[in-house]
């Protein structure tokens, strides 16, 4: 039987093994979309435990735990200990077999911490303690882990109203061998006109852009101004969470009317939203 998580894990033939070991493995990581928190990278955050690193904000793991019947307090609760949360994740992991979460968990244990044991309730305490001990070492800081994986560049997910201060300060002070961290333009909130919080968001945009927004054209001008600000601070790409492309016909006057309704907090019709 083939060993799980060996050096040729998911590399099922010689061509795949050659391409990975002799080519891809030597290349740097350039990540166009990540969920890293800019403040943690900028401050070279030191993780207090494997729970903070793994479960501090991973909604994929939380979803699996909820599906496994784990109480919400062990996912996002503030009154449970790091060990209690990790223990519940360890209870869930065996049930994620054949899900990428199972692969990721054990690949990370092996490649970051040198741990080849399978995570389960029986091994949870041992793995928890070993990971936490290693996290005290400088090379396990946020940037240290990025360097370990040969990360050359990450693009974070940033809203047009973000001030990008972490990116700006990081760019000023980063060492030559530190990975690049640049913002990516994620304007979903400006597009979601049907959202109840849309008007409040437009007011935030108005404040940070310095553009008084009374009509749709003003919002476009404000977004252009923020887009220029992002570009001036290294942004090279947009990152959109679009589930469906709309192709309804519209006129400029209709768009202005729809925008005014949304700003008054009035409910839009399906057609108006799609326009």
Model-flagged regions — what are they?
Residues 2-275:
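Metal-cofactor-binding active-site regions of metalloenzymes
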